[in-house]
């Protein structure tokens, strides 16, 4: 693991930075107590918020870089965070205001750069010099008034924008707020973070959360904090409490023990209407819901709230009682479309299943007809799948909807034979069949979409929405839970029966060489990344038993866990992408696409394969598409700019009207992030985080900025 860069502050740097942000408050307690401005002064030259603007459309009016000259783009500067490690990722969409860029490293250090040169101005280490305990995924920061707000694990920090130091008075003297507090569960026994930055409305920061997909898990409350003090102003319970609408769609005690239904992909604010829009994920555990019978409002829903109070305005549940990890993967996008010759403000929402939902903004009515389709209800004992699901009739899906034998790979006879063997073993009968024990389940589109967290881009001038799509099937097998050891009952669902990994989590066979017993026990208690905190589910002796097994591979006792409220009869035995014998997708290309959809009509304007596998391309097998993570930006003057592809490390520019490739370059690592564009001193730049690390691809830690010569 390479060490992360430590702060380097020369006098010249600090003087230059002070000139850039003159007028920002000093980090003393008295000034921290004053309410900061609700948002930075927006300018066409800036990329002032995550997603580019408050509508989250990834749209810019900057026009120096054009379809005619984009092919002449050159690297303007690079910034190596020196923080990449095996498996690390860097998904930040940088914020740029007044010539300063703010973003994060793979180890979640926050930094500020001169956006014209890439020169570091300050850097903040939230972990006090300690190495990271696990991989982190983080998509950016909020810059507002005198402060930079970002999340590290359960800590929500407010940093002084000028110096990068925590602001006393935000959450007390520490300069951070504990996101585990205020959820109705013991704070030290749950795991809560926020991979996507929140939004600013007036004097509030409104934010979703990332919680474990296994049990125990925290509830996914949407919360608003005072920008000045970090005080919690309001919460919206996505798992309703007694007396709240939607409570009847869960078991009676679900509000005490259920988790998930969280807006991990971010939230969007309409400041003129004082409305907050959120898109939520599934309830935990993802694949077996006997503990959460019912439709599970407000999981898998688009929710509109009063941004000042958190009061419910409207909601629409896209998927009832999710059993396939089909979270809504991106923040809602605010768009204006044409209906009967008149402009109508709307909310667009992409899904992992490859659908685009379009809702009238104030009341939430779908703007295209919706079909209610009957679903199979055969399931494991205790499970009660929803008997029907909703589907928009338009736009048509941007991903294939069902896997058949005709869709299996024909890359080579051997690849087809391997894929056919797997297909016949799983024998899928319906894209919404409940996960089972007897044969397993093929989830298609897969758990990474369809659409993913990069989200779409939207051109308000044409009404076209642009979205990259993954075309990967995933394999899932459940098995009865084994109570022979606490490890088998608690951990094997992700890490395999013998610590070998392969069921959605990494191998732990060598964890004793990487961590001390105390570190492992702390991780079990407090959680780490997507792993839940087990402090609420077991006592110290139970955690010690699991630690001993992880360190030695030997079962030291046979304590049972069936009495736990988090105990389920079934767990994950296998969970991975459907691949052939050589590690390529087991289905026919395209394995990833880039799509343009007209939201005025619901029709697809164009769709092209997106991405390549370099080894296959060298054999003449080109234009296959690959999975992609990160989104596009669209320019008023005709460009669609996107990196995102996992294996070819390319950054591309397309003609937004036709999908024609205009320019491409190879990055130091995959740009699994959304780029930002901005202007400093009369020059337009485009910057992308090159973090890699997805699905076994090499990791990186470099930001690369491009400009015209």
Report each predicted region and the residues it spans.
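Extracytoplasmic/lumenal domain signature
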Residues: 68-82, 110-131, 156-189, 221-257, ...
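C-terminal motif of bacterial Sec signal peptides marking the signal peptidase cleavage site
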Residues: 21-23
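Bacterial N-terminal signal peptides that target proteins for export
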Residues: 2-14, 532
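Periplasmic c-type cytochrome electron-transfer domains
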Residues: 53, 399, 406-420, 424, ...
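Repeat-blade elements of multi-bladed beta-propeller folds
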Residues: 47-51, 87-109, 133-156, 190-216, ...
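Extracytoplasmic electron-transfer domains, predominantly the class I c-type cytochrome c fold
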Residues: 193, 485-558, 689-690
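Bacterial signal peptide processing site
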Residues: 25-28
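Mature N-terminal segment immediately following signal peptide/propeptide cleavage
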Residues: 37-86, 94-96, 119, 595
């Amino acid at each position: 693991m390479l060490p992360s860069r430590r702060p380097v502050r020369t006098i010249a740097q600090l003087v230059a930075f002070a000139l850039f942000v003159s007028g920002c408050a000093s980090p003393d307690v008295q000034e921290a107590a004053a309410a900061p401005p609700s948002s930075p002064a927006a300018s066409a030259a800036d990329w002032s918020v995550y997603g580019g603007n408050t509508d989250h459309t990834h749209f810019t009016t900057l026009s120096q870089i054009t379809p005619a000259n984009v092919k002449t783009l050159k690297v303007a500067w690079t910034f190596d965070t020196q923080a990449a490690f095996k498996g690390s990722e860097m998904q930040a969409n940088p914020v740029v205001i007044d010539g300063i860029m703010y973003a994060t490293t793979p180890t979640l250090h926050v930094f500020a750069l001169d956006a014209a040169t890439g020169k570091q101005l300050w850097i903040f280490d939230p972990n006090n010099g300690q190495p990271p305990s696990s991989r982190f995924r983080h998509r950016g920061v909020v810059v507002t008034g005198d402060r930079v707000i970002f999340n590290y694990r359960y800590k929500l920090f407010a940093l002084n924008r000028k110096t990068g130091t925590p602001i006393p008075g935000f959450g007390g003297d520490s300069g951070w707020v504990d996101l585990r507090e205020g959820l109705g569960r013991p704070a030290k026994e749950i795991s809560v973070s926020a991979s996507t930055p929140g939004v600013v409305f007036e004097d509030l920061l409104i934010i979703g959360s990332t919680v474990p997909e296994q049990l125990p898990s925290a509830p996914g409350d949407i919360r608003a904090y005072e920008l000045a003090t970090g005080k919690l102003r309001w919460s919206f319970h996505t798992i309703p409490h007694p007396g709240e609408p939607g409570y009847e769609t869960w078991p009676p005690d679900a509000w005490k023990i259920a988790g998930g239904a969280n807006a991990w992909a971010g939230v969007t604010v309409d400041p003129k209407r004082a409305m907050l829009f959120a898109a939520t994920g599934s309830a935990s555990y993802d694949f077996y819901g006997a503990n959460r019978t019912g439709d599970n409002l407000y999981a898998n829903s688009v929710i509109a709230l009063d941004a000042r109070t958190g009061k419910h305005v409207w909601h629409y549940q896209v998927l009832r009682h999710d059993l396939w990890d089909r979270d809504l993967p991106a923040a809602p996008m605010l768009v204006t479309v044409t209906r009967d010759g008149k402009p109508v403000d709307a909310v667009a929402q992409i899904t992992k299943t490859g659908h685009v939902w379009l809702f009238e903004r104030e009341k939430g009515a779908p703007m295209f007809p919706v079909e209610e389709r009957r679903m199979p209800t055969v399931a494991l004992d205790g499970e009660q799948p929803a008997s029907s699901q909703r589907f928009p009739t338009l736009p048509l899906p941007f991903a294939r909807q069902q896997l058949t034998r005709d869709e299996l790979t024909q890359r080579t006879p051997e690849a087809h034979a391997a894929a056919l063997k797997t297909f016949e073993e799983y024998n899928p009968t319906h894209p919404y069949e409940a996960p089972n024990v007897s044969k397993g389940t093929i989830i298609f589109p897969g758990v990474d979409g369809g659409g993913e967290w990069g989200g779409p881009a939207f051109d308000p001038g044409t009404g076209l929405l642009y979205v990259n799509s993954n075309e990967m099937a995933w394999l899932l097998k459940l098995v009865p839970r084994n109570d022979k050891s606490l490890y088998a009952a608690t951990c094997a669902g992700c890490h395999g029966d013998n610590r070998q990994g392969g069921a959605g989590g990494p191998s732990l066979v060598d964890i004793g060489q990487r961590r001390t017993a105390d570190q492992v026990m702390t991780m079990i208690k407090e959680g780490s990344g997507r792993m839940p905190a087990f402090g609420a589910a077991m006592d110290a002796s139970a955690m010690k038993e699991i630690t001993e097994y992880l360190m030695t591979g030997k079962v030291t006792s046979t304590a049972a866990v069936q009495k736990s409220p988090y105990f389920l009869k079934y767990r994950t035995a296998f969970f991975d992408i459907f691949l052939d014998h050589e590690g390529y997708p087991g289905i026919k290309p395209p394995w990833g696409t880039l799509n343009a959809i007209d939201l005025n009509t619901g029709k697809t304007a164009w769709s092209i394969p997106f991405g390549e596998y370099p080894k296959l391309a060298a054999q003449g097998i080109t234009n296959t598409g690959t999975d992609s993570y990160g989104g596009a930006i669209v320019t008023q003057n005709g460009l669609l700019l996107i990196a995102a592809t996992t294996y070819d490390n390319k950054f591309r520019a397309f003609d937004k009207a036709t999908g024609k490739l205009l320019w491409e370059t190879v990055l130091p690592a995959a740009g699994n992030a959304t780029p930002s564009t901005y202007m400093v001193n009369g020059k337009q730049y485009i910057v992308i985080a090159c973090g890699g690390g997805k699905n076994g691809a090499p990791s990186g830690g470099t930001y690369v900025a491009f400009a015209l010569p």
